[in-house]
UniProtKB/Swiss-Prot annotation:
<keyword id="KW-0356">Hemostasis</keyword>
<feature type="modified residue" description="4-carboxyglutamate">
    <location>
        <position position="59"/>
    </location>
</feature>
<feature type="modified residue" description="4-carboxyglutamate">
    <location>
        <position position="69"/>
    </location>
</feature>
<feature type="modified residue" description="4-carboxyglutamate">
    <location>
        <position position="65"/>
    </location>
</feature>
<dbReference type="Pfam" id="PF00089">
    <property type="entry name" value="Trypsin"/>
</dbReference>
<keyword id="KW-0245">EGF-like domain</keyword>
<dbReference type="InterPro" id="IPR033116">
    <property type="entry name" value="TRYPSIN_SER"/>
</dbReference>
<dbReference type="InterPro" id="IPR000742">
    <property type="entry name" value="EGF-like_dom"/>
</dbReference>
<keyword id="KW-0106">Calcium</keyword>
<dbReference type="GO" id="GO:0005615">
    <property type="term" value="C:extracellular space"/>
</dbReference>
<dbReference type="GO" id="GO:0005543">
    <property type="term" value="F:phospholipid binding"/>
</dbReference>
<keyword id="KW-0325">Glycoprotein</keyword>
<feature type="glycosylation site" description="O-linked (GalNAc...) threonine">
    <location>
        <position position="211"/>
    </location>
</feature>
<feature type="modified residue" description="4-carboxyglutamate">
    <location>
        <position position="60"/>
    </location>
</feature>
<feature type="modified residue" description="4-carboxyglutamate">
    <location>
        <position position="47"/>
    </location>
</feature>
<keyword id="KW-0964">Secreted</keyword>
<comment type="subunit">
    <text>The two chains are formed from a single-chain precursor by the excision of two Arg residues and are held together by 1 or more disulfide bonds. Forms a heterodimer with SERPINA5. Interacts (inactive and activated) with ixolaris, an anticoagulant protein from Ixodes scapularis saliva. Interacts (activated) with iripin-8, a serine protease inhibitor from Ixodes ricinus saliva. Interacts (activated) with FXa-directed anticoagulant from Aedes albopictus saliva. Interacts (activated) with guianensin, an anticoagulant protein from Simulium guianense saliva.</text>
</comment>
C-alpha cells in the first residue's frame, strides 16, 4: 500500500517541475536581447556620432587619428583640425578682391579671382603689360609692379595715363579715311597671338664697334649686281588700297619716271627703304600719295632726295642689314593718302607688336612672278612665320636682322617691285613699321615665304640717321650717299 503512494507523489512532483520549467527558460531571441551589450553613453571618439564631434572635442582632448576615424575623409578632417588646433586663420578675412581663404596650421592660402595675384590677391594683374597691354593705347612698360604708358611721336599721353591723343591733323599710323566696309587691315586681330615658337632675341644692329667711322661718302652713281629677279622681293594676290588706307606708302621712281622700289614715310623729311634699292637706279626721286601710276588723282607729289643714308654693313651676298633712310630736299605735306607710319619702341614691339598674328605689306610690285608691274597700289595681309619654319624653308641664310611672313601654300606674296616697301602691324587702330620688304625666292612659291628686314633691330640706327643732316654739298647734282652705322 505504501509503495503505490510513493509513485503517485513522485509523478506529481515531476509534473510540477515541468510546469515550473516554462517560467524559468525563455526563447533564444529573448535571451539575446537580454544579454546584448548596451552602448556606453559619452564613450570616446571611436563611439561618437559625427554631429557631436566638435562638442565632444571641446570637453576632451582629441587626436588627429580619432578625428579622422569619425570624418572618414581627409579634406573634412583637415578643415576641422586646422581650426581646432590653432584657430581659424581666415577669421580676419585676409584675402582681398573677393579671393577665397583656406585655413591651414599657422597659415592660410588665398585663391584669387582671374586678374589678381599675390599673397592676399592684392595685385591687379590686368594693369600689367602682359594682359591687355596694361590698357595702354600704345607703348607699355612695367615699373615697380605698375604700368607706365607712353606714345609714339606725334601723340601726347591723356590725363588718364592710358590714351594717346594726336597733336596734329595727320598723326602717324592712322589711316586717313576709314573704309565703309571692313578691310583686310581692319580684319587683322590685335588680340591674336603669333605661334608660340616666335621669339625675338634682344639685339640691336646699331650696337656696333665704336671704332667704326659712322659716315663715309660714296659715289651715288656706282652700280651693284642684283641678286637676281627670282630672289628680289617683291604683291601677288591681295587687294587694292582704297583712299587713305595705305597713306605711308612711298614709291621710288627712276629717271624714266618708272617705279622700281617702295618706301615707308616716317616723317615729313624721311623715307625708309631697302639698301639694295639704292643700286637699281643712278638717280631717283620719291613719289608720295600715288594709288594709280597711270592716272593722276590730284594728291600725288614728287620730292627730290637730298641725302641717302645706307647701313654700312649691308651685304649684297646675303642681303643682311638691308636698310636705308632717305632725306628729302623739301618736306612732305600730309593729306589724304599721305601720312607717316609710326616707329615703335623696341621692347614693346618685340613683346607685343610682333606677337600679333599678321602684318600688312603694300606696294606696286608684280602681280605674279613673271608678270607686269602693278599700276595700282595693293595691300596684303601676311601672317608672321615662326623662325624655325622660316629658316627651314629658305635656301639662303636667314640672319637675326630678318624675319619671314606670308603663306607656304596660298598664292599670295610680295613680288618684284615691292622691295623697300612697308611691312606694318596694326595695334588698336594704329599702324607701326615692323619690316621692310627685302627679298624672297620667287613670288608666292609653294613652301616659300617673303623675307623682311626686321625694323626693331634698327630703331636706334633709324633714330640716329633721322638726325643726320648730311655732309657738305658735293659738286654733283646727285644726292649724297652716306654709309652709316651710328654708334650705340
Amino acid at each position: 500500500m505504501g509503495r503505490p503512494l510513493h509513485l503517485v507523489l513522485l509523478s506529481a512532483s515531476l509534473a510540477g517541475l515541468l510546469l515550473l520549467g516554462e517560467s524559468l527558460f525563455i526563447r533564444r531571441e529573448q535571451a539575446n536581447n537580454i544579454l546584448a551589450r548596451v552602448t556606453r553613453a559619452n564613450s570616446f571618439l571611436e563611439e561618437m556620432k559625427k554631429g557631436h564631434l566638435e562638442r565632444e572635442c571641446m570637453e576632451e582632448t582629441c587626436s588627429y587619428e580619432e578625428a579622422r576615424e569619425v570624418f572618414e575623409d581627409s579634406d573634412k578632417t583637415n578643415e576641422f583640425w586646422n581650426k581646432y588646433k590653432d584657430g581659424d586663420q581666415c577669421e580676419t578675412s585676409p584675402c582681398q578682391n573677393q579671393g577665397k581663404c583656406k585655413d591651414g596650421l599657422g597659415e592660410y592660402t588665398c585663391t584669387c579671382l582671374e586678374g589678381f595675384e599675390g599673397k592676399n590677391c592684392e595685385l591687379f594683374t590686368r594693369k600689367l603689360c602682359s594682359l591687355d597691354n596694361g590698357d595702354c593705347d600704345q607703348f607699355c612698360h612695367e615699373e615697380q609692379n605698375s604700368v607706365v604708358c607712353s606714345c609714339a611721336r606725334g601723340y601726347t599721353l591723356a590725363d588718364n595715363g592710358k590714351a594717346c591723343i594726336p597733336t596734329g591733323p595727320y598723326p602717324c599710323g592712322k589711316q586717313t579715311l576709314e573704309r565703309r566696309k571692313r578691310s583686310v587691315a581692319q580684319a587683322t586681330s590685335s588680340s591674336g597671338e603669333a605661334p608660340d615658337s616666335i621669339t625675338w632675341k634682344p639685339y640691336d644692329a646699331a650696337d656696333l664697334d665704336p671704332t667704326e667711322n659712322p659716315f663715309d661718302l660714296l659715289d651715288f652713281n656706282q652700280t651693284q649686281p642684283e641678286r637676281g629677279d627670282n630672289n628680289l622681293t617683291r604683291i601677288v594676290g591681295g587687294q587694292e588700297c582704297k583712299d587713305g588706307e595705305c597713306p605711308w606708302q612711298a614709291l621710288l621712281i627712276n629717271e624714266e619716271n618708272e617705279g622700281f622700289c617702295g618706301g615707308t614715310i616716317l616723317s615729313e623729311f624721311y623715307i625708309l627703304t631697302a639698301a639694295h634699292c639704292l643700286y637699281q637706279a643712278k638717280r631717283f626721286k620719291v613719289r608720295v600719295g600715288d594709288r594709280n601710276t597711270e592716272q593722276e588723282e590730284g594728291g600725288e607729289a614728287v620730292h627730290e632726295v637730298e641725302v641717302v643714308i645706307k647701313h654700312n654693313r649691308f651685304t649684297k651676298e646675303t642681303y643682311d642689314f638691308d636698310i636705308a633712310v632717305l632725306r628729302l630736299k623739301t618736306p612732305i605735306t600730309f593729306r589724304m593718302n599721305v601720312a607717316p607710319a609710326c616707329l615703335p619702341e623696341r621692347d614693346w614691339a618685340e613683346s607685343t607688336l610682333m606677337t600679333q598674328k599678321t602684318g600688312i605689306v603694300s606696294g606696286f610690285g608684280r602681280t605674279h612672278e613673271k608678270g607686269r608691274q602693278s599700276t595700282r597700289l595693293k595691300m596684303l595681309e601676311v601672317p608672321y612665320v615662326d623662325r624655325n619654319s622660316c629658316k627651314l624653308s629658305s635656301s639662303f641664310i636667314i640672319t637675326q636682322n630678318m624675319f619671314c611672313a606670308g603663306y607656304d601654300t596660298k598664292q599670295e606674296d610680295a613680288c618684284q617691285g615691292d622691295s623697300g616697301g612697308p611691312h606694318v602691324t596694326r595695334f588698336k587702330d594704329t599702324y607701326f613699321v615692323t619690316g621692310i620688304v627685302s627679298w624672297g625666292e620667287g613670288c608666292a612659291r609653294k613652301g616659300k615665304y617673303g623675307i623682311y628686314t626686321k625694323v626693331t633691330a634698327f630703331l636706334k640706327w633709324i633714330d640716329r640717321s633721322m638726325k643726320t643732316r648730311g655732309l657738305p654739298k658735293a659738286k654733283s647734282h646727285a644726292p649724297e650717299v652716306i654709309t652709316s652705322s651710328p654708334l650705340k
